[in-house]
From Swiss-Prot:
Chain's gene name: thiG
The protein's name: Thiazole synthase
GO molecular function annotations of the record: thiazole synthase activity
Localization, UniProt: Cytoplasm
BP GO terms, sorted: thiamine diphosphate biosynthetic process
Subunit composition and interactions: Homotetramer. Forms heterodimers with either ThiH or ThiS.
Binding of 1-deoxy-D-xylulose 5-phosphate, residues: 156, 182-183, 204-205
EC category: transferase
Protein family (similarity comment): Belongs to the ThiG family.
One GO term describing the cellular component: cytoplasm
Pathway assignment: Cofactor biosynthesis; thiamine diphosphate biosynthesis
Pfam families per record: ThiG
UniProt keyword Iron-sulfur present: no
Species of the source: Shigella dysenteriae serotype 1 (strain Sd197)
């Protein structure tokens, strides 16, 4: 069970809505993923009407919507987008994204922390996308963020857990859920993230651009379940030395 703020989710997989070939394919993939928490960019939906091609099927699917501020380059822009989302969708939940450089899409740590502190004070449930910086993640937690969402690698890069060493520190010190966001490229990346202690992963590009997004979404669902089950089962410790699983000499002694 994944608990963030006042909500609980059976699934530990968060999904996005971008890059799908059609809204129908998007919804089919989300259903196959089992995800109950779905992000959507405010710049991609018509907030004036709920029959928007992206928004309407998501509402019908019964998932929890997590609007994001993708496209914001400053704290002020992100705060403005957050209030638009709250007014239009009736939710205090927000994925905070501030990335001023369109080439790399790396989160701005200074603007993110500034916006997070203000938005928490204004009653938002803030889930910030951030770099895999243990100090920053702790500061975001201290100002009241409901979770932290450090990147595994740049958005859409499919590189996997390139920041693993820093993610391990973040997981160890966090008292709020840690959701690895960005860079997850194949289901094995998601399984590894859950095995190492992450509470959830957010996957969008890897599902949306697959040749078969629906089956890829199912694969991610199974991978997340496997990673979580493996962690809960108590994996054996790593060793530099070999440890025999069967007696090496007993059968020789028995035959003498």
């Amino acid at each position: 069970m994944l608990r963030i703020a006042d909500k609980t989710f059976d699934s530990h997989l968060v999904t996005g809505t971008g890059k799908f070939a059609s809204s129908q394919l998007m919804v089919e993939a989300i259903r196959a993923s089992g995800s109950q928490l779905v992000t959507l960019a405010m710049k991609r939906v018509d907030l004036r009407q709920h029959n928007d091609a992206i928004l309407e099927p998501l509402i019908a699917a019964g998932v929890t919507l997590l609007p994001n501020t993708s496209g914001a380059k400053t704290a002020e822009e992100a705060i403005f987008a957050a209030h638009l989302a709250r007014e239009a969708l009736g939710t205090n939940w927000l994925k905070l994204e501030i990335h001023p450089d369109a080439r790399w899409l790396l989160p701005d740590p200074i603007e993110t922390l500034k916006a997070a502190e203000t938005l928490v004070q204004q009653g938002f449930v803030v889930l910030p996308y951030c770099g895999a910086d243990p100090v920053l993640c702790k500061r975001l937690e201290e100002v009241g963020c409901a979770a932290v969402m450090p990147l595994g690698a740049p958005i859409g890069s499919n590189q996997g857990l390139e920041t693993r060493a820093m993610l391990e520190i973040i997981i160890q010190q966090a008292t709020v859920p840690v959701v690895v966001d960005a860079g997850i490229g194949v289901p094995s990346h998601a399984a590894q993230a859950l095995e190492m202690g992450t509470d959830a992963v957010l996957v969008n590009t890897a599902i949306a651009v697959a040749d078969d997004p629906v089956n890829m979404a199912k694969a991610f669902r199974l991978a997340v379940e496997a990673g979580l089950l493996a962690r809960q089962s108590g994996p054996g410790s790593r060793s530099y030395f070999a440890h025999a699983t069967s007696p090496l000499t007993g059968f020789l002694e028995a035959s003498v």
